[in-house]
Amino acid sequence: MERTEVLKPRTLADLIRVLHQLFAGEEINVEEVQAVMEAYESNPAEWAVYAKFDQYRYTRNLVDQGNGKFNLMILCWGEGHGSSIHDHTDSHCFLKMLQGNLKETLFAWPDKKSNEMIKKSERILRENQCAYINDSIGLHRVENISHTEPAVSLHLYSPPFDTCHAFDQRTGHKNKVIMTFHSKFGIKTPFTTSGSLENN
């Protein structure tokens, strides 16, 4: 059947083409998108042009704008880099490991009181694994806990967003954060000093 071929993108360009097909309609089939992203086997020769690292923080590098339906980006995590605890602004978030490992820690939404946030689970995501989260599942923090190996991950957000909330683990208090891109389509963007969710 033609459908099974669609689920096996052979290249990053092929994956992007299939994603455009999957997001052409109004409804999103989460399982299908996740299966397609997981089926793509990471090939550094295809994505290295987008993988722009920063010495001090993880970076967000835009790969494709998905006709306004989604943003596809590559995140580059140096040794020890991590995000804060954050939400996803009512968007679908798919994460696929391209290189290395990342630790994902899931948190419950904080209550109105000023209390330490409750950790729900944690896991290690390994090369070619895919994960999914949305705000109904909870909040998460993503970190490269290796001190010797960088990590690279492919993220799809639908619908795209440019602000989200970062949370203080000790109090549950949140701050609005404007998200920026370190590079777009393989070209470094100016003024990227703000707007990542790094741990402070």
UniProtKB/Swiss-Prot annotation:
GO terms for cellular component: cytosol. GO terms for molecular function: cysteine dioxygenase activity; ferrous iron binding; nickel cation binding; zinc ion binding. This is Cysteine dioxygenase type 1. It catalyses: L-cysteine + O2 = 3-sulfino-L-alanine + H(+). Keywords: Dioxygenase, Iron, Metal-binding, Oxidoreductase, Thioether bond. Monomer. The lineage of its organism: Eukaryota, Metazoa, Chordata, Craniata, Vertebrata. Its cofactor is Fe cation; Ni(2+); Zn(2+). Its EC number is 1.13.11.20. GO terms for biological process: L-cysteine catabolic process; taurine biosynthetic process. It is an enzyme of class 1 (oxidoreductase). InterPro entries: CDO_1 (IPR010300), RmlC-like_jellyroll (IPR014710), RmlC_Cupin_sf (IPR011051). There is a cross-link at residues 93-157 (3'-(S-cysteinyl)-tyrosine (Cys-Tyr)). It holds the Pfam family CDO_I. It comes from Bos taurus (Bovine).
